[in-house]
């Protein structure tokens, strides 16, 4: 059954297949009784007990449309986004490419999302039934990226169980400059100042690139500790590790995910 369904899905454009998955989750009901629970895999994070440590990363439910159906399927947590202050289309299509032989995917979506206002309203009107993280980032053409992060912190701090600061997507030009010691220090200092102004205790996570050298790993770690960042998300997609890939789509620009990321 699964192999036949997989074969059918893989005949579709990958972004269309993703859209169909979102639509299917919106209209179907999945009974909770089918979800296996065990005390052996219960996990506590940010003071909340999760039934299991398996969650959905940002990038699947970009616009916070199906987080509750995902909880109903049994996921321990869901992270929505990446959300930017203003809605944006992202990069031009096609922008998602399968590499079947390599068990991988390349995407250059570019933070396509409905924008902070609409996504906030959606979450506020549909209470999450589990741990919900909100992944935030700057608009593509923003003149002040640091301020974009602050706008999103201000918008979502009171409805997110945690906020993820995305500094690592390879599909937003120069975003990874925030891995630089001085820039990251300024960003985290500004976010903590804003949290203080808001009297917010919302935990902060930082999502980093897998392409960091050892020297910068140490510097970034020092920064995260200095600013009391509660969680590190490792990792985003890579723009390296392509030399041994087979599929011709390896030449496409974008972030690589899947099995090659293990190397």
Where in the sequence are the language-model features?
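Hydrophobic faces of well-ordered beta-strands that scaffold small-molecule active sites
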Residues: 54-58, 76-80, 107, 132-136, ...
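N-terminal amphipathic alpha-helix/helix-capping segment at the start of soluble metabolic enzymes
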Residues: 33-56, 118-128, 199
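An N-cap/entry alpha-helix motif that binds or orients negatively charged groups
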Residues: 2-43, 107-112
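Active-site-adjacent beta->alpha loops and helix N-cap segments on the catalytic face
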Residues: 86-95, 116-118, 125, 171-200, ...
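Active-site cofactor/substrate anionic-group-binding motifs, chiefly glycine-
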Residues: 50, 66-88
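A gly/proline- and charged-residue-enriched helix-loop-helix capping module
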Residues: 81-131
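Glycine/Thr-rich beta-alpha phosphate-binding loop at enzyme active sites
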Residues: 22-36, 170-183, 217, 223-263
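Active-site glycine- and acidic-residue-rich loops that bind
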Residues: 138-150, 205-225
């Amino acid at each position: 059954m699964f192999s036949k369904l997989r074969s059918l899905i893989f005949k579709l454009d990958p972004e269309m297949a993703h859209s169909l998955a979102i639509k299917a989750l919106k209209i179907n009901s999945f009974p909770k009784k089918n979800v296996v629970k065990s005390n052996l895999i219960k996990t506590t994070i940010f003071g909340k007990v999760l039934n299991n440590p398996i969650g959905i990363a940002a990038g699947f439910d970009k616009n916070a449309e199906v987080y509750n159906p995902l909880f109903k399927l049994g996921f321990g947590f869901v992270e929505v986004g990446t959300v930017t202050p203003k809605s944006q289309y992202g990069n031009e299509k096609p922008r998602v490419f399968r590499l079947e032989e390599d068990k991988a995917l390349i995407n250059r979506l570019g933070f396509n999302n409905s924008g902070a206002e609409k996504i906030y309203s959606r979450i506020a009107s549909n209470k999450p039934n589990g741990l919900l993280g909100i992944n935030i980032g700057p608009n593509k053409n923003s003149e002040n990226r640091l301020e974009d992060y602050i706008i999103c912190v201000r918008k979502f701090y009171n409805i997110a169980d945690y906020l993820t600061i995305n500094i690592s997507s390879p599909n937003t030009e120069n975003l990874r400059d925030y891995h630089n010691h001085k820039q990251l220090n300024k960003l985290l200092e500004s976010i903590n100042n804003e949290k203080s102004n808001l009297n917010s205790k919302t935990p902060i996570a930082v999502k980093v690139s897998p392409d960091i050298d050892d020297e910068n790993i140490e510097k970034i770690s020092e920064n995260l500790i200095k600013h009391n960042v509660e969680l590190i998300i490792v990792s985003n997609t890579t723009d390296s590790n392509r030399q041994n890939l087979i599929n011709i789509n390896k030449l496409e620009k974008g972030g690589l995910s899947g099995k090659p990321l293990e190397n």
